[in-house]
Amino acid sequence: LPNDERVRQAKGNKQVLLKNIMTAKFEGILRPIAVEVLSEADVKELSAEAFFLTVLQHEIGHSLGPSMITVGGKTDEVGKFLKEKYSAIEEAKADTLSMLNTLYLLDKGAVAKDLEKTLLPTYLAGLFRTIRFGLEEAHGTGVMIQFNFLAEKGAISYDAATKKFVAHAADIRGHFRELARILLDIETRGDYAAADALIKKYGAPTAEVKEALTRLTHVPVDIKPVYPVVR
């Protein structure tokens, strides 16, 4: 924060994540979601550390890419050109860059290598966590752009017999790099028509996703931290 690009350019921004709260979200929300919607093999690979890292990199991802652009001789914030499509594109961009950033850290040895096998299953469970804030909201549409794109590439499949989704990690670097290029290109050019086309192609929830969400009513959407200092 803050979200105002003029303030960010002039003064910078600050990110704060509380790891104990993130761990509580992982154990109380993300893991129960995964049990309902992911394959048994993927549930076994879940990692609180991968969850924390990808959320951290999501927030960093918001600050990567263009903020102010010039289109047709007019300079303004990216969101002014993408209008109502901006938030969904931006959320999808931040998620996509979170995976690329984390994979980069893995490749550079900055993160333990054994975390890699946990990354895609944890990310996939995280998509279901996020989408529950609202299918029609920016985060929900942004999630479905990623989900449907990755499913098209074969990185996510659905087992009709078990009604569970399966993560396939082969070439995930290539898949996320391709999606990041599409999203960043839209933002760099302020291309409203391309944003609209991408959302129309990938932004709608599938029947399988909708059905999976009906099995999550017993899982909290979020947690409510209680701070002893204000009791």
Give short role names for the model-derived ranges.
Residues 176, 180-231:
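Extended, compositionally biased alpha-helical segments that mediate assembly or anchoring
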Residues 46-50, 87-91, 117, 121:
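Solvent-exposed, acidic/flexible segments
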Residues 1-79:
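Active-site-adjacent "gating/activation" loops or surface patches in catalytic cores
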Residues 99-195, 201:
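Long, well-structured alpha-helical subdomains associated
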Residues 77-87:
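Short beta-alpha connecting loops at secondary-structure transitions
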Residues 87-104:
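An active-site-proximal "capping" alpha-helix that borders the catalytic cofactor pocket
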